[in-house]
């Protein structure tokens, strides 16, 4: 799958699903997936997990092992397929609207990878929340 196809599929899913996300998220995913050979598998898993979240609702979905609460505001969605990929998407809920916002995607290799990813996610969350004030 080439870059344009991947970006088109990501944009189509994010738009169609109504998932609120930081504008940099598709770029995060593109840089993680481009030329990896796992693009289609990842997208299938990502769509499946978002659909599952919608069906179960927040309370039940976040009880699943793929979801992890990082702190008071930030959560992690773990999308993996054995040794093929181990991608995390950090998200939060908007402080005013309560809407879930996908903030930042990264490839988790070590637990230290979270440190910089959390900083990026909070910067993006602050940007989005400042825009609504």
Regions found by a protein language model. Give the residues of each.
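Basic, Lys/Arg-enriched alpha-helical interface segments
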Residues: 1-86, 95-99, 107-133
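A short, basic-hydrophobic beta/loop patch
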Residues: 102
């Amino acid at each position: 799958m080439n870059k344009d196809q991947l970006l088109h599929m990501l944009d189509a899913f994010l738009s169609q699903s109504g998932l609120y996300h930081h504008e940099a998220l598709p770029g995060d995913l593109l840089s993680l997936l481009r030329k990896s050979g796992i693009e289609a598998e990842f997208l299938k898993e990502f769509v499946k997990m978002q659909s599952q979240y919608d069906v179960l609702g927040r309370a039940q979905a976040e009880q699943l092992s793929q979801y992890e609460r990082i702190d008071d505001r930030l959560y992690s969605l773990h999308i993996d397929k054995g040794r093929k990929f181990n991608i995390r998407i950090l998200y939060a809920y908007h402080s005013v609207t309560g809407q879930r916002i996908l903030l930042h995607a990264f490839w988790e290799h070590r637990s230290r990878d979270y440190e910089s990813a959390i900083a990026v996610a909070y910067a993006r969350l602050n940007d989005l929340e400042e825009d609504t004030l």
